[in-house]
Structures are given as structure tokens and as C-alpha cells.
Regions:
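Alpha-helix N-cap and coil->helix boundary residues
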Residues: 26-29, 79, 135
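Polybasic "coupling" helices that flank or enter modular domains
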Residues: 107-156
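Cyclic nucleotide-binding regulatory module and flanking cytosolic helices
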Residues: 1-39, 95
């Protein structure tokens, strides 16, 4: 029995996971396998999931609400890099793979719900599911490209 099996809204959460941009291609047995590593977190508005500079990183699947990715300067100026909504992912996968600290923070903008798991476990799951790994890494690159384009536009 997984943590999700005990959740009072397990059916809704399973539906939301199946609609996630990265997870929607998983078959039922793979989704069940993934569920055993997931933790469901209900977040308050402005709750920090990941602090810039941290090495403790997780993979997030946004089930409900809005998250933001923000970077802070030494003089406490903040810039929002992106928002993630229901069906999106939020991750620091590239930093984790490079064994670097998180270059940004992730926080909830609204009350939100996420499914989360340590990036080490997520990477192991991806290694066992090559097609998923390919689509996930493509999504990470797409997001990074969008953020780069947005940042360049802001500074022109």
C-alpha cells in the first residue's frame, strides 16, 4: 500500500497525475510503480519548496494551484523566472545532474498541492523508463529555453 492509497482524495490525485505533461504517457503499471515514491503535499500561499543554494532537491508535479520559480540577488532583489500551474512540473533536475546547488527557489503563489519525490529516486525511475526520460528531459530543455528567452527580452 502506498501513501497515496491512504489519501482521502486518492482518485482525484491519480486523475491529476495521469494528466501531467510528463506523466500522461505512463501505463498503469508504471504509474503504480511511481506512486510508491510520491509524497502528496498541500502547500500554503508563499510556502517555499526549494531554497536557492540548497542541495536537497525534489521533483514536483503540480496537481493544483500555482508555483513560481524565483532567483534572488545578493541585495535581495527577486526576479520571477516562470510560473507552473496544474499539469506542469517544477524541477531543479539540471542542477542536480550537474551536482550543483539550486540556482533558484521554488515557492507556492497560491494554496497548492504537489506530488513530490527526491530527485535521486526520480532519476532512478527515469533510467528504468527511457521513453519517459527522453520526454522529461525535452520538457526540461523547453522550459529552460523559454526562461532564457524571457530573461533576454527583459534585459533588452
Amino acid at each position: 500500500m502506498t501513501i497515496l492509497d491512504k489519501h482521502p482524495e486518492k482518485n482525484l490525485i491519480r486523475l491529476q497525475l495521469s494528466q501531467n505533461i510528463v506523466l500522461q504517457s505512463l501505463d498503469q503499471s508504471s504509474m503504480t510503480e511511481l506512486e510508491s515514491s510520491l509524497e502528496i503535499s498541500d502547500l500554503k500561499k508563499s510556502e517555499i519548496l526549494l531554497r536557492q543554494g540548497s542541495y536537497q532537491m525534489e521533483q514536483y508535479f503540480v496537481l493544483d494551484g500555482i508555483l513560481k520559480r524565483i532567483v534572488s540577488s545578493a541585495d535581495a532583489k527577486e526576479m520571477i523566472l516562470r510560473f507552473a500551474i496544474e499539469k506542469d512540473i517544477e524541477t531543479s533536475y539540471a542542477a542536480w545532474r550537474l551536482q550543483r546547488s539550486a540556482p533558484y527557489s521554488i515557492a507556492s503563489v497560491t494554496k497548492a498541492r504537489v506530488a513530490r519525490m527526491p530527485l535521486k529516486k526520480w532519476a532512478e525511475f527515469l533510467d528504468a523508463h527511457p521513453k519517459l526520460k527522453e520526454s522529461f528531459e525535452f520538457e526540461v530543455m523547453r522550459l529552460m529555453s523559454e526562461i532564457m528567452a524571457h530573461t533576454i527580452t527583459l534585459h533588452m
